[in-house]
Amino acid sequence: MLKLLLSPRSFLVLQLLLLRAGWSSKVLMSSANEDIKADLILTSTAPEHLSAPTLPLPEVQCFVFNIEYMNCTWNSSSEPQATNLTLHYRYKVSDNNTFQECSHYLFSKEITSGCQIQKEDIQLYQTFVVQLQDPQKPQRRAVQKLNLQNLVIPRAPENLTLSNLSESQLELRWKSRHIKERCLQYLVQYRSNRDRSWTELIVNHEPRFSLPSVDELKRYTFRVRSRYNPICGSSQQWSKWSQPVHWGSHTVEENPSLFALEAVLIPVGTMGLIITLIFVYCWLERMPPIPPIKNLEDLVTEYQGNFSAWSGVSKGLTESLQPDYSERFCHVSEIPPKGGALGEGPGGSPCSLHSPYWPPPCYSLKPEA
C-alpha cells in the first residue's frame, strides 16, 4: 500500500533513509545435527558497503573434559588476516541472559584460537549458547547452541587390577574419577602373546570384567577406555586408553625379531617352492613319456632286441653313435747289420726276408770303388 501512495523516486529515497538508520535482520541456519544451531546476525551498513560480502566466522567446537573444564576452540588460520576473535557465552535457561566474555583465552601463534571454561561455569544439562565475534567488525558474529551432555570426554580409566576368581578365571577391575559409574560405558580389549589382534567387549555401568577361561601358558594384556553412555548423554567420543596390565608373568613373550623373521621367511619360502615346482613341471613336460610295460614285448618279439629301431631313432644317428674300434697297422722292417746285405736271406735275394703283411721294397748295394 505504501508503494502505491508514493512515487517511485520518493519510495527509493525512503528506502535509503531506512538503510542509513540501520535495521537488523536475523537469519537462522539449520544443519544436519539437531543439537547444534547457529544464529548469524548481520547488522546493516551504509549503502556504499553493502556490495562487499561478509566473510563467515569459523565454527566453534566445544568439549567437556571429565566435567572438570571445557575447551571451546576454532580454526584461527581460516581468517584471511590474523584476527583476535572474541568469545562470549551464556546459558539459554538462566536468570541472566546477557553474554559474558571468556576469561581464559587459548592462543595459537599469538592469535586467539579458543577459550577454556572452568568447572564452576559448566552447566551440563542446560543449552549452552556461544557467540564468536570479530571486534574489528562488530557486524561479523556467529551464535551456536550446544548440548554439553553430548560433548563429554571422560578421563582414561585408572588403577587397573587383576585377580583370580578360580584356577582358570580372571577378573579385571578399574576406577574412574569425577564421573558417576552409571553414566559411563566401557570398552575392554585383551589379547594373549599368541594373538595378532585384540578381542574387545562393551561393559556398561560396572567397572569390572571377567574372563572365564585363561591359559596359564600364555601372557595376557588388558586395557580399558570409557565414554559418556546414553543414560546421561549421547557422546560418541571415547577417552584415551588406560595403561595396560598383564597377567602370566611366568610366560616368556615372543621375541619381536623372531616374528619379523617369520614374516619374511614364510613368503620367501613359499615363492621359492612355487618356482621350483614350475621348473620341475617344465622339465617333466620336455622328457619323453615312459612307455607302459606291456609295450616292451614288441622290443623282444618284433624288433628282436633292436632298441634303436623300436624307439624310432634314425639309422644314421645310430651309426654315428656306434664306437669305432679299427686301428691303422704300423709296418716295421728290420735293418740289416753293418756290412751285410739288406734283407739278403739264404736264397740270396734281398726280398726273401720281409714282413708277412706287405712286400717291402727291394734294395741292392752298390759296390765301393
UniProtKB/Swiss-Prot annotation:
Localisation per UniProt entry: Cell membrane; Cell surface
Gene Ontology terms: biological process: B cell differentiation; CD4-positive, CD25-positive, alpha-beta regulatory T cell differentiation; cellular homeostasis; gene expression; interleukin-15-mediated signaling pathway; interleukin-2-mediated signaling pathway; interleukin-7-mediated signaling pathway; interleukin-9-mediated signaling pathway
Lineage top rank: taxon: Eukaryota
Keyword match Disulfide bond: yes
UniProt motif (WSXWS motif) ranges: 238-242
Domain Fibronectin type-III: start-end pairs: 156-254
First-listed, main subcellular location of the protein, grouped into a coarse class: membrane
Family, as annotated: Belongs to the type I cytokine receptor family. Type 5 subfamily.
Comment field on protein domains: The WSXWS motif appears to be necessary for proper protein folding and thereby efficient intracellular transport and cell-surface receptor binding.
Purpose: Common subunit for the receptors for a variety of interleukins. Probably in association with IL15RA, involved in the stimulation of neutrophil phagocytosis by IL15.
Name of the protein: Cytokine receptor common subunit gamma
Organism: Mus musculus
Gene designation: Il2rg
